[in-house]
Amino acid sequence: MEPPPAPGPERLFDSHRLPSDGFLLLALLLYAPVGLCLLVLRLFLGLHVFLVSCALPDSVLRRFVVRTMCAVLGLVARQEDSGLRDHRVRVLISNHVTPFDHNIVNLLTTCSTPLLNSPPSFVCWSRGFMEMDRRVELVESLKKFCASTRLPPTPLLLFPEEEATNGREGLLRFSSWPFSIQDVVQPLTLQVQRPLVSVTVSDASWVSELLWSLFVPFTVYQVRWLHPIRRQLGEESEEFALRVQQLVAKELGQIGTRLTPADKAEHMKRQRHPRLRPQSVQSSFPSPPSPSSDVQLTTLAHRVKEVLPHVPLNVIQRDLARTGCVDLTITNLLEGAVAFMPEDVTEGSQSPPAPSAPKFPSSGLATPQPTALTFAKSSWARQESLQERKQALYEYARRRFRERQAQEAE
């Protein structure tokens, strides 16, 4: 039986904070005056929480006091199956939802979390992160930290996804480096619920996330402890990471994907393109209803068809009419953003490519075959090895299109 299709990045990351439902939007507008008052009040209370957490030593009393004060701020921390917590395990593994996940888990148990891709600073320390050296030395530093004989031992809380998701659909691919530190890890699941607005937005800063957390009535963090997992004999770190990812995803009722933080960055870039599309459509096609624009659209579609002969012509025309940009249409087709059934190259190729066939005797025939494999029916298959093939496809398609354009200009 074929596994369910993995969700794409558009389902793992929220791009809008406000609700799209009219009733919820009206409720948010009515709540706004109360929320602003809570925000101002909680900002002053939050300063006291920060001072108390700095003044008190790490202990059960400190965690109880700070946890109670955080509940007043609207940050409610709950946990399930706390009896499964094994204090001998030095590495804790969790999914990542908000910039404050490590602070919430630290209210329940003592732990330390390194801040990736950021130098040591006051902001790093004030946010509750552990100050570490450069990224290249991170793993070795963490191994030394876990090997220390300090009592009581302080476990590491690591987020192998390295980027936060919306916590509803699936998990990013787990990086292997957190699983190379120790042979035993204890996973935990983290679920976050918040009324009226999204829990997190893909391109928001931690400051804006903090302000929204203080604005809404409450945010509930639900932590569930799982049994410790030991590395199997001869198991590589990548295999260990994949096994833990599938377990955490199963406990959350989600799907473990192969998407990485790089896919999130590309998704955020593509989210900005729709704002530019109406302008590009107007500049490329000044009068859409006129016959001349239809002729121009057909001409551009045939040019793209010459570059990507396995793509149906009507699919190319439809996406060109929407984007008005040849480069963007080629990108959408190569990345699988436009669904279609690939044509056979011999059937889908048109007569115009014949004059330029001698120029590309080998690449013109060999390149479309792996491209056709990219657009499988299963989204899981489309995501496999995307990073390895995408750049080569971009360069080939765009180079071929520009060379044909230069030939016609001559």
From Swiss-Prot:
Gene Ontology biological-process entries = ERAD pathway; lipid droplet formation; lipid droplet organization; lipophagy; protein localization to lipid droplet; response to virus; retrograde protein transport, ER to cytosol
**Does the keyword section mention Acetylation?**
yes
- What does the record say about tissue specificity? Ubiquitous.
* Phosphoserine modified-residue sites: S292, S363
- What modifications follow translation? Monoubiquitinated and diubiquitinated.
Identify the residues that the record assigns to the CUE domain, covering every copy: 296-338
Q: What does the sequence similarity comment in the record state about its family?
A: Belongs to the AUP1 family.
Q: What is this protein called?
A: Lipid droplet-regulating VLDL assembly factor AUP1
Q: Which organism is it from?
A: Mus musculus (Mouse)
